[in-house]
Amino acid sequence: MDSNTVSSFQDILLRMSKMQLGSSSEDLNGMTTQFESLKLYRDSLGEAVMRMGDLHSLQNRNGKWREQLGQKFEEIRWLIEEVRHRLKTTENSFEQITFMQALQLLFEVEQEIRTFSFQLI
């Protein structure tokens, strides 16, 4: 796992948690929760790849891991669309920078999860 990605996640989550977007703050908390969930999922896939013989363990623990993987990609696509929408609608430069970095991070995480999953297949 790349330490820059971990610090990027922590930085963006911290920034998003400090944003006050009025009535949409509940939506933002949901996005933050999904970011955290994706980070944990990506980390668990990365650990499984590091152990390389762990595919059978992963399949036994979660017989529907491919279905779960598909759901994670759907979550990523949804988050990307949400972040893009917020980026278009906000005029606050701090929020724009944060959402641009969040978007970049989502693309990186999507690529990492895709790479990990191909190694496990």
Swiss-Prot record:
Q: What is its main location?
A: virion
User: Where does the secretion signal sit in this chain?
Assistant: none
Its annotated compartments are:
Virion; Host nucleus
The UniProt entry, under InterPro entries, shows:
Flu_NS2
**Does the UniProt entry include the keyword Chloroplast?**
no
**Listed SUPFAM superfamilies:** Nonstructural protein ns2, Nep, M1-binding domain (SSF101156)
Which Gene Ontology cellular-component terms appear in the entry? Answer: host cell nucleus; virion component
Spell out the family assignment given in the record's similarity comment.
Belongs to the influenza viruses NEP family.
Q: Which HAMAP family match?
A: INFV_NEP (MF_04067)
Protein name as annotated = Nuclear export protein
* Organism of provenance: Influenza A virus (strain A/Wa-182)
Give the source lineage, highest ranks first: Viruses, Riboviria, Orthornavirae, Negarnaviricota, Polyploviricotina
